[in-house]
C-alpha cells in the first residue's frame, strides 16, 4: 500500500469513491448512484481499489460507461495502481397493474405493443428480450400474437414442440438463452387461427399461466398489434408491470401509437416509453443515413404524453436477415452498433420500469454478473 492510501481510513476511502460516483450522470439514473445506495463495497488490497456496485435493474452497458468516465479520477484521488470493478444485480419484483397476483416464477412482465402492424414490434420485442439477457437478467418471452405468431421463426425454433412433464403444464422452449412459448409451437404455418376474440384471449391466458416458467427477472410479452377488444382484455387481465409502445416516424403509425398509449392509460398500465423503429434507413452499400419515414414524430409523441423516448432503432438489411435466419442481431452480431443500441434500450427499459414502479418487499433475488 502506498503512502497516499495508508493515510486513508476505510471510511475515507469509501467517501472518496462515493463522491466520485455521485457526479456520474446517465439517462438511466433518476437519482445519482450514491443516493440510490448502489455502492455496496469498497476495499483496498495490493495497491488495487476494489469497487462493487449493486443495482436494482440491469445496468451493464451503463456500467461500462461509468468505468470509462470515473476510473481515471479514482486512480488519481486514491493513488491506486488499478481498479477492480464489480457489478451485481438485485432485480426487484415491482408492483403489478391493479395489484394483481403475479405469475409463478416471473418477477416483472413487460408488454411490447404497437397500435398497428408492420412497425417492427416483434423484432423489437425479441431483440429487447435478448438484450436484457445480455445485460445480466433471466428473461423469457411470450408470443401473444395468437393470429400471427412470429417469435418461433425469429428465434430459429419453429420446428420445436413444447413438452408437458406433468400432463397439465407446458415446459417452455429454450432458445438463445430465453424461456419462450408461443401458439406457433402448437400449430403449423398452414393452419390459420380462426378463433374469436374471447377464445384467443383465453388461449393466451392459459399459455401464460400454465407454462412452467423458470425464475425470470423479466418476461417480455409480444402483444398482438392494434387496440381492439383482444388487446384491451389482455392488458386488463395480465399482471403487467409496464408497457413499451413501438412505432415508426410515419404519421399513420404515430396516430395508432397514440391509441395504444391511451389504451394502457385507461387500464392503468404504466407506459414506460416509446421505441421509434426504422428511425433512419442505413444503406448497406454506402452507409448513407436517410430518414425515409420522417423525423421527430416519436419524440413529439413522447413529450405530448409525458413519457420517454426510450430508443431509436435504425432500418438495416442485416437486422431483417438475422431474424430470417433465426439468429437475431443481439445474438449473431454481439459487437455491432445495432446490438449496442438494443442493449442501451434494455438498460433504459429496465431502469424506467424501476423508477416508475413500486418495489414489492421480500421478492428480490441476488445474482452477480
From Swiss-Prot:
Is Repeat found in the keyword set? no
Where does this protein hold ATP? 115-122
Q: Which superkingdom does the taxonomy of this entry point to?
A: Bacteria
Sorted alphabetically, the keyword list is: ATP-binding, Hydrolase, Iron, Iron-sulfur, Metal-binding, Nucleotide-binding
Biological process according to GO: iron-sulfur cluster assembly
Any single Gene Ontology cellular-component annotation? cytosol
MF (Gene Ontology): 4 iron, 4 sulfur cluster binding; ATP binding; ATP hydrolysis activity; ATP-dependent FeS chaperone activity; metal ion binding
Describe its function: Binds and transfers iron-sulfur (Fe-S) clusters to target apoproteins. Can hydrolyze ATP.
Similarity field: Belongs to the Mrp/NBP35 ATP-binding proteins family.
PANTHER family to which the protein is assigned, alphabetical:
IRON-SULFUR PROTEIN NUBPL
Oligomeric state and partners?
A: Homodimer.
**Which protein, by its recorded name, is this?**
Iron-sulfur cluster carrier protein
Organism encoding this protein: Escherichia coli (strain K12)
Gene name on record? mrp
